[in-house]
């Protein structure tokens, strides 16, 4: 049976409704793929760019944690400057080029590995993964096959998860504590399975900032690749705050033209300067200020979507000049890549 296509997707099942405090600790999290590999600029970061990121973190007294450590820190309401560096896919360039730089600056990271490709021509082997783990790198689960699971059946995802966990346990002596969805694609059934297996959290590929009340099983990360990895862009993302959405509902007349409804507290946000984008282009929006300072926002594309994955992004400045960020990845499984 195909994964259910939900025309009404109630994300508040995970986000819930909660009381917002004046200060909530938050952590910017970044995702990298290849390091110093000019063949693939869309997923590569130049080594001088990556080292500039690390130097800035060091010079400005940031704690750099694994994802598991960061999720635990959020529970403590700590206000220590903190960042999380994650790496997807387990390419050799991480081991050869990035790991030495992390060691140089005394930082850790979380490396998400898809087990089927381990030992392939462009990928780390198990010995290199063990060596990275011994150097303090957290190893996360990125599936076995890196498949498009929204196009499969629930059993396929369950079996893939079991296969990857068995390989991790056999080769590393333990299964990972965190998971990264291939292509950032997930649904309710996948979330529920990952949570039921005892993982601490899971990450997707939409951009945003971690915070205590955020849903822990589809967490956002800022992508870092050559075009978007300039130091000023990295610093800007480090200083970004979460838009703490208390309710989110997604409806679609058809999959190609969704409508997203959000609710959040106005607090010190300059909502008249709200910006919304659909895959980088401006979107249609309507907004009203309801009782008790609740902002109700509707965003939608101005035309039918033609991509498999489309990122909706909302940013709002506050009275202190800080930007608050929320994004949502809309997936149309019927479109092949």
Segments predicted by a language model, with ranges:
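Terminal accessory/targeting
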Residues: 1-81, 103-109, 115-124, 224-337
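Histidine- and/or cysteine-centered catalytic micro-motif in compact active-site loops
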Residues: 114, 144, 207-208, 265
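Acidic, His- and aromatic-enriched active-site or binding-groove loops in soluble protein domains
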Residues: 199-208
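Metal-dependent polysaccharide deacetylase catalytic core of the NodB/CE4 family, i.e.
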Residues: 25-41, 63, 72-83, 91-192, ...
């Amino acid at each position: 049976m195909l994964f259910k296509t939900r025309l009404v997707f109630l994300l508040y099942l995970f986000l819930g409704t909660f009381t917002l405090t004046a200060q909530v600790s938050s952590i910017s999290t970044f995702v990298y793929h290849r390091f110093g590999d000019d063949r693939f600029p869309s997923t590569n970061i130049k080594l001088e760019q990556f080292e500039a990121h690390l130097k800035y973190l060091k010079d400005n007294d940031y704690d750099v944690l694994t994802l598991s450590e960061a999720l635990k820190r959020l529970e403590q309401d700590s206000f220590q400057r903190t960042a999380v560096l994650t790496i997807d896919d387990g390419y050799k360039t991480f081991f050869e080029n990035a790991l030495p730089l992390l060691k140089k600056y005394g930082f850790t990271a979380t490396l998400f590995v898809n087990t089927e490709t381990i030992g392939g021509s462009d990928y780390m082997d198990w010995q290199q993964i063990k060596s990275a783990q011994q150097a303090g790198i957290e190893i996360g689960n990125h599936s076995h096959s890196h498949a498009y699971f929204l196009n499969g059946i629930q059993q396929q995802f369950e079996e893939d998860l079991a296969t990857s966990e068995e390989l991790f346990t056999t080769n590393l002596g333990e299964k990972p504590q965190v998971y990264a969805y291939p292509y950032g694609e997930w649904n309710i059934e996948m979330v529920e399975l990952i949570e039921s297996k005892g993982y601490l959290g899971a990450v997707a590929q939409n951009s945003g900032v971690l915070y205590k009340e955020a849903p822990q099983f589809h967490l956002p990360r800022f992508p870092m690749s050559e075009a978007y990895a300039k130091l000023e862009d990295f610093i800007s993302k480090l200083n970004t705050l979460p838009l703490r959405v208390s309710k989110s509902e997604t409806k679609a007349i058809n999959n190609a033209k969704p409508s997203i409804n959000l609710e959040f507290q106005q607090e010190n946000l300059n909502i008249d300067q709200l910006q919304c984008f659909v895959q980088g282009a401006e979107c249609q929006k309507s907004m009203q200020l309801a009782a008790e300072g609740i902002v109700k926002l509707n965003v939608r594309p101005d035309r039918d979507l033609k991509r498999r994955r489309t990122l909706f992004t909302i940013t709002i400045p506050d009275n202190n000049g800080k930007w608050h960020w929320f994004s949502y990845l809309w997936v149309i499984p019927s479109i092949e890549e």
